[in-house]
Amino acid sequence: MSKRKNVVMPGTQDILSQMGEQIKLARLRRELPAELVAERAGISRATLWNVEKGSPSVAMGAYAAVLHALNNMDRDLLLVAKDDEFGRKLQDLGLLTRKRAPKKEG
């Protein structure tokens, strides 16, 4: 049985790598050993290493657990897609377009 390979767009991988680096810097600024953060997050040291590298194969829950272990930084996840300007514009366009009722048979 082979492992499923995660296909990630280059721009997305850049974002994940940057996020992983920021998580690592947050841990280092707090002078927290990797072993302690991994234990607090309930993950292995290897998984923490993958989080800090921005690996796309790591579950979103692991990223959230690590952020929580860094003094409740997981609350920042609430900011993801909060301002969906493009989605709102699409929704507004749909609301402006008049929809006709289906023709009655008879």
Give the residues covered by each predicted segment:
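DNA major-groove recognition helix of helix-turn-helix/homeodomain DNA-binding modules
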Residues: S2, G61-L79
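Short alpha-helical DNA-recognition segment
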Residues: E31-W49
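Short, charged recognition helix plus adjacent turn
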Residues: L77-G106
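Residues that mark the N-terminal boundary/hinge immediately upstream of a DNA-recognition element
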Residues: P33, A59-A62
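A short, Lys/Arg-rich alpha-helix, primarily the initiator
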Residues: K3-R29
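Short basic helix-loop element that most often maps to the first helix and adjoining turn
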Residues: E21-V37, T97-E105
